[in-house]
């Protein structure tokens, strides 16, 4: 019956676009066969089936009669629920799905909100200076309000002198002119004062915000940096903080002054002519309402524009930071195209934002000019009717112009404030983040009790950026105190992940990692990384400072003699001394002025200067030539003596002397033993040895010289 229902349509034909292969069947277990729950579920299923089938059937005018298969549909719709109700354990429920279901809509990131609490934290230390700046700005604004009144009185004197032709214009206008000059001078001093204070407050706040943001970023989990680009983070430290600082200064310097001038001028206008002021009072709220509506859209555009700028900065930072790789592969054109594409998107967003702000300002100017025209028309009528003096009309016009300029300044400021709030929200977003793995806090094992015994017990782990893909699966490993344990295997087997968990860059999802019986999650992470574990990677990163400071990076309070000792242990003292500046030699950005072997030996010295109990060597010699590998390997052998060492190696020849070799595959231990024991087993380790030996022999054998073609010889002749 069910097959017949699915095979034939209500008009006697197959349902277009449907087949039996597109059906999914699901059997209900006995645990879900209670009458109430099952009956309601079955009724919902059949109803869904009918709706989906009806949606996929071709629309046509109603038929004059039903085909026999139509009665099957009607009967099936009525009978199937009853049959399934009575026999829930024996029947199959058909769940029909369209082959081409609409793709799931991506979840939109929540809109960032400005964190006023953090803003108050940075503003609080500067409240006294801010209060003084506000007082000075208000004073300057009030002075501006008084100027139109004096100008109106001066115009009235001019009109009186012109009308009556008596009296001395100079004697009558001298007092008002002096008052105006004094007001102009006071206005200039007040403006100078509040701008100086605002500059001081803005720069101090920007410095504090950058310090706090940089500190917060440094304390974030490694998983945070796995998901974020360096260029975007640098953009928040520089561009976003600068944008917020500029907006903050403008809000006080222009925004507060303009608002005060608008309020003061409106009071003066109401005293001069209530009728004209009423006209302004009707128009101004309407303009403010329109501006508020436009603001929400401009705010979203501003946020999108800043995010696009951060993406473009990330592309540029990535290309410039890896310029040697770009040059080696001749990919300058590709990187230019990538950056240009991001800039095009950024330019489009910025132009769209600019058009929105321009529209707002243009509409504002039209409205304000119409207000001036209306003021002249109505005010002129009042002057003609002897209801308003000519000087008062002049004062009203100047005051209304002050209102116009202030409102225009606010309209320009509006776009800046929108960008500033968005930039501040982006800055405060990362300040408010709390790392899952703290930098400090926890137990510190006394130095006399540290043995360096490491145990991985049933560890399961997947990277936060790739949840659900387990890199380690029920992984168990023991590193005895003072022994060398090597991890080998094919790429992607989880070797480097083991080192990352030991450094506690991440926490395992299941299981535990212990040091001398103490779970790493109970220990102080800074103490663990700073004193117990030394880490040497395949690509050591040096800072653009001197050799002395790079080695001392492992122990900031180390003396010069300790630096020299660590360099000797790392076989680095000799080549350092050969430089003209010795230990004061600047190595360049990321150590670009040094060879690979020299950088690696400096990294070894940096790790050894803190005398770690546990040493991690993550393919420390795989990128070196034979001679550099020999020198570095000597330093590593010397450094490994008496320490618990975890060696991650690709070249199996470097781990033959290890006390234990662990062969990893797919996040699990598949073989373990010494070099000789694993060779005897003839397993994966033996196969890896055979492959590397074969590759080495093929590389070392020179290709046979191909005889020249006689034709080519003749052409050369």
From Swiss-Prot:
Channel activity inhibited by ATP via ABCB8/MITOSUR subunit. Its main location: mitochondrion. ATP binds at residues 489-496. InterPro entries: AAA+_ATPase, ABC1_TM_dom, ABC1_TM_sf, ABC_transporter-like_ATP-bd, ABC_transporter-like_CS, P-loop_NTPase, Type_1_exporter. It is a multi-pass membrane protein. Residues 1-25 form a transit peptide. One of its GO terms (biological process) is mitochondrial potassium ion transmembrane transport. It is found in: Mitochondrion inner membrane. SMART domains: AAA (SM00382). CDD domains: ABC_6TM_ABCB8_like, ABC_MTABC3_MDL1_MDL2. The mitochondrial potassium channel (mitoK(ATP)) is composed of 4 subunits of CCDC51/MITOK and 4 subunits of ABCB8/MITOSUR. Interacts with PAAT. Interacts with NRP1; NRP1 regulates ABCB8/MITOSUR protein levels in mitochondria. This is Mitochondrial potassium channel ATP-binding subunit.
